[in-house]
């Protein structure tokens, strides 16, 4: 039984990490095929609000990792005449682990990340825009609800690589990995709604 639980947990982690790797490969291929290094004029400021699901990364007292929730908001400034943006973020994700597989003996490790971000948009302004992003900032780690292992509240560095694609300038699908403190790392997928930052109409267009 323990062997089955461990394999299930490892399989879930491999699925998430494989998805991230495949997304990075797809972005690289699409960027190579784009063949256009020029940037497209878009709105200077944009924001996206996102929700999603995540799983714990790494071992923490041999707990069985379970699916949990995440949410966040990004505000970005699109740097003129480039494909880069820079901004700020608030990201909240949980690393949920079950310790008896009965739902009554668990711990939910929460991370709140606040900081700065930068991203490269491979096809900025197009209907399909792959991107790669780095988030770096301040992490607040605590435990939500029941405490199997007393932890308290601690702070540290928050780091998160993100890859994804923006569709039709208003939907944003992302895969990420959050790194902060042992027992609190997580990886997952999110879906966001983008406000602003749309492609500007060419002055020559009627």
Positions of PLM-derived features:
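Extracellular loop and loop/strand-boundary signature of outer-membrane beta-barrel proteins
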Residues: 58-61, 100-106, 145-151, 176-178
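Predominantly the C-terminal beta-signal and adjacent terminal strand-loop region
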Residues: 40, 89-99, 152-155, 159-206
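Gram-negative (and chloroplast) outer-membrane scaffold detector with strong preference
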Residues: 69-146, 167, 171, 192-199
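Short glycine/proline- and aromatic-enriched beta-strand/turn motifs that initiate or cap beta-hairpins
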Residues: 31-86, 187-200, 206
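Residues that define the transmembrane beta-barrel architecture of outer-membrane proteins
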Residues: 41-47, 65-71, 108-114, 128, ...
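Cleavable N-terminal export/targeting peptides
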Residues: 1-44, 199-206
């Amino acid at each position: 039984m323990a062997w089955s639980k461990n394999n299930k947990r490892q399989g879930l982690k491999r699925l998430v990490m494989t998805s991230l790797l495949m997304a990075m490969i797809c972005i690289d291929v699409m960027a190579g095929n784009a063949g256009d290094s020029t940037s497209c004029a878009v709105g200077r400021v944009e924001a996206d609000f996102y929700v999603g699901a995540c799983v714990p990364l790494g071992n923490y007292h041999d707990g069985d990792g379970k699916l949990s929730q995440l949410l966040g908001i990004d505000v970005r400034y699109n740097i003129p005449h480039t494909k880069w943006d820079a901004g700020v973020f608030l990201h909240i994700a949980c690393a949920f682990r079950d310790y008896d597989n009965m739902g009554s003996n668990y711990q939910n490790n929460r991370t709140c990340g606040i900081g700065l971000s930068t991203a490269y948009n491979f096809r900025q302004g197009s209907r399909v825009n792959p991107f790669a992003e780095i988030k770096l900032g301040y992490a607040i780690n605590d435990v939500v609800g029941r405490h199997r292992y007393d932890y308290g509240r601690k702070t540290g560095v928050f780091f998160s690589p993100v890859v994804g694609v923006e569709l039709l300038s208003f939907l944003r699908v992302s895969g990420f990995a959050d790194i902060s403190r042992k027992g609190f790392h997580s990886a997952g997928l999110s879906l966001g709604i983008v406000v602003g930052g749309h492609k500007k109409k060419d002055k020559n267009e009627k």
